[in-house]
């Protein structure tokens, strides 16, 4: 069985590990928690949501809803966990963060083709690897990625902008 290493146990890393394992690959999932946390992470589980608990609109006629429908049809682990941990949120799919993380962690730990290892990765392995470490990548690994790619990492924060009332054009806004 071919082996693939996935670095990072967040949303992308868990989904990548799951899909590879379901396709018959032997997956080694490397996650640095609980040995090392980032400033945003607080919980020891995988697939930790650090910002909003909302996975956005659930309507099929929205881009976010269509993506979720497609992921579900493709056997997405995270969509299954999201549905099982859903909380009331109007037309959005929102989840209980702890339950969502616990469900994803349990599924990853119990998959026969996935080995979960706790490790702070500082270099990209020479073997087939998916790097899914996100915007808070450990400094040593970020430097190794830069060495391989020849450029620094660039991420945009998902924090919502703050708009002051005084800055609004009262002729154009609706209250």
Predicted regions and their residues:
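Rossmann-fold NAD(P)-dependent oxidoreductase module
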Residues: 19, 107, 144
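Helical element adjacent to the flavin cofactor pocket in flavoenzyme catalytic cores
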Residues: 97-116
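A short alpha-helix-loop-beta-strand transition element characteristic
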Residues: 59-64, 68, 76-91, 149-157
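Beta1/beta-strand and adjacent pyrophosphate-binding region of the FAD-binding site
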Residues: 1-12
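Short beta-strand to alpha-helix junction loop
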Residues: 57-63, 86-103, 133-139
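Predominantly flavin-linked oxidoreductase catalytic cores and closely associated redox partners
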Residues: 110-175
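N-terminal FAD cofactor-binding segment of flavoenzymes
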Residues: 18-80
């Amino acid at each position: 069985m071919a082996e693939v290493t996935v670095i990072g146990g967040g949303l992308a890393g868990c989904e990548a590990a799951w899909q590879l394992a379901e396709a018959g690959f032997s997956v080694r999932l490397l996650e640095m928690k609980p040995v090392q946390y980032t400033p945003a992470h607080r919980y020891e589980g995988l697939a930790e949501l650090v910002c909003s608990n909302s996975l956005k609109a659930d309507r099929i006629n929205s881009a976010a809803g269509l993506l979720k429908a497609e992921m579900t049809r493709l056997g997405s682990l995270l969509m299954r966990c999201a549905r099982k941990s859903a909380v009331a949120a109007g037309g959005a799919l929102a989840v209980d963060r702890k339950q969502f993380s616990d469900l994803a962690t349990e599924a990853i730990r119990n998959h026969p083709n996935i080995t979960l290892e706790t490790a702070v990765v500082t270099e990209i392995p020479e073997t087939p690897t998916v790097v899914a470490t996100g915007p808070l990548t450990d400094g040593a690994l970020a430097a190794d990625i830069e060495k391989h790619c020849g450029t620094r990492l660039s991420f945009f924060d998902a924090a919502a902008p703050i708009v002051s009332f005084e800055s609004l054009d009262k002729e154009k806004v609706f209250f």
